[in-house]
Curated annotation (Swiss-Prot):
UniProt name for this protein: Arginine biosynthesis bifunctional protein ArgJ, mitochondrial
Gene Ontology biological process terms from the UniProt entry: L-arginine biosynthetic process; ornithine biosynthetic process
PTM info: The alpha and beta chains are autoproteolytically processed from a single precursor protein within the mitochondrion.
Family: Belongs to the ArgJ family.
Compartments reported by the entry: Mitochondrion matrix
Residues the record marks as site: Cleavage: A223, T224
Active site: T224 (nucleophile)
Organism the protein comes from: Aspergillus oryzae (strain ATCC 42149 / RIB 40) (Yellow koji mold)
Amino acid sequence: MAAFARMVKGQVRSYSAPVDMAIPASKRKFIPSSGSYPKGFVVSGTHVGVKASNTKFPDLALISSETPCSAAAVFTTNKFQAAPVQVSRDIIKTRQGQGIRSVVINSGCANAVTGKGGLEDAVSMGKKVDECDGLNEPSTLVMSTGVIGQRLPISKILKKVPVAHANLSSTHDAWLTTARAICTTDTFPKLLSRTFTLPSSPGRTYSLAGMTKGAGMIHPNMATLLGVLCTDAPIEPSALQSLLKHSVNRSFNSISVDGDTSTNDTIAILANGAAGGAPISSSSSDDYAAMQDILTSFAQSLSQLVVRDGEGATKFVTVRVQNSPDYESGRLIASTIARSPLVKTALYGKDANWGRILCAIGYTQGVAPGTVVPEHTSVSFKPVDGSPVLNLLVNGEPEQVDEERASVILQEEDLEIVVDLGGGEKGEQGLGGEEAVYWFCDFSHEYVTINGDYRT
């Protein structure tokens, strides 16, 4: 028992300042050493000390465009919506997704369930950024992350906003520092960027960058999950909103760490069009279709970093539900498996207990009639090394499982669970149907320790 206590103590990342410990060696591979960032965007990460114990780490992030942007966002469905969620939602609605210049984010305090005063604090954060830009209309989205039920040290934040504005930069180091500033229990900053082209301008290069944070309280439905994406492609607000909604549904809304949905979850995207070209406005255009694929793939890669940093996680698990009669039914089944504590703890214990997976499939609520037919259902483990799949259940019949091989597969950090519904009532095994993919992690002793100590 003493040895176990020492092991857990060595792993724990207590909630304090953003990324206040050395980044674990196993996570360093996820931190980019360079990037391709969109034209016209500048960023900064500044120390405020929102949380009293934070004496040196950046905890105020500012992302700004040198020109007005189209903007879109998706927000938490939690009924206790934090003040910055309410304020940002109102700004996008009032401005109709036009003329947005910046996003300001603090870590260390969620500004959630803080009443009228909390709303005033969120408004004042955005207004202070607008003043630095010489703007009279609300043009800054606001996000916060941290402990719920506490007021922001707003005077400290407002004092540092001009400093953050003065430090705005387009360098890779600035982007990485900004990604660091939004972290709480995260063990590493989550930042990605890429270039792309569009069919209408094959010779023109565009860039897309994004940062996110989250390690616990992750089961979004749009620890706290926040994300900001920026592109220099020209996209009209209505098209941008539909593009974001589609991509988030297949990325940030398809991950789970612990099944909890935060009061603050927000994913926003800004498009300033600085790279030129014809604006994307119609969902029927080739550019729209290409951008949808690009944004969805990018958002999936970014959201998967959250799962890889799940509190106490030792495994990154992909669950792939095939041959569902419709996408949403497949996603509901994948989500139920991903949320199951029994599945997650079995994976942590390296136990090929496929009965727990089958149980989760069977009690999934809200799926289309005929989606789950026991005699059509198959479950398997797919190794990431490309070796043959390990069948656990085929057409409702259990396989003679090679426990030794199952143990080898479960020793790996990455694992894929494949659930084949056989198309339900629509057809034979393996024919037709939709595919839904979800990403999640296991439950370990460390998760309990981290969250038991969260406010201390």
